[in-house]
Amino acid sequence: MRKLLLIITVFFTFNVAQASLPNIVASVNDEPITLNEFRARKKMIMALNNVESLTPAQDKQLSDLALKSLIDESLLFQYAGDREIPQEEIENAIKSIEDRNKMPHGSLLQYLKSRSVNPDSFISQIKSELIKMNILSSLSRSVQVSNKEIDVAILSSDQKDVEISMQVFTSKDGGNKAFTQMNNLKNRLKKCADVKKSLYDNFATMQIITDKLSKIEGVKQTIVKDLTPDKASNVFEVNNKFEITLVCSKKILNVNEDENNYVVNFLTNKKISQKAQKMFENMRKKAAIKIMLPS
């Protein structure tokens, strides 16, 4: 009898331990994230992704995702402080989601309610996304894209031909002394406009070439493509002599305004994204985040 009572007691204790979860699952700078918020977020994610049931492994992934989103949300709300998100912006964001999913206006919240999801969890996430968008908007004002960056991006796409102007230096012989002299010359080549005949005349010749990149022969085309204006190549052996190419200019041909704007927008968004990612990473590093949810 005593043994039976012990077994019942152990079994009961085990089940209580398994079933119970702390009322606070995490805290962010002493701001609590409650168990109810955590469960509501999980339920919301399942509803929005039309998921009915989960394996234990999937449930673990969902728990991690829900907790991360709540922590990020808390950080964003703390960053925003007392600044309120206007109700009109929230409603417009919900309408935008409904439009993308071809849903009648007002039906999204009704759908969530029909899945027993607390709409407050969804609206809270909408608010945090709007705060994030405001941050991205403010970051965009500090982002600039140079013409050089635009040219590099277009060149790397291999979609447009380029007119290249370059100075090609060729040694007069192929000996070790000539190789040393050419290496010394390479280190002194800074700008095409500053090149003087006295720099190379004793041991090399110089030829100015202007042509389309597509018409330059194989190996030299590869070398030139990777060089920026006023940048000299390494010393290469060509036909038993040594050669250096100094690019003077690159002019991309046949780029219209729409193509140029597309590249500018792409590079701008990339820079904003990189800045935002760094900002959010720093925000997380500086925050006091405690997770009480059992792993």
UniProtKB/Swiss-Prot annotation:
Keyword Signal: yes
Pfam families, per the entry: SurA_N_3
Disulphide-bridged cysteine pairs: none
Cleaved signal peptide residues: 1-19
Claim: Signal is one of the keywords in the record: yes
Domain of life: Bacteria
Keywords linked to the UniProt accession: Signal
PANTHER family: CHAPERONE SURA
Protein name: Uncharacterized protein RC1023
Source organism: Rickettsia conorii (strain ATCC VR-613 / Malish 7)
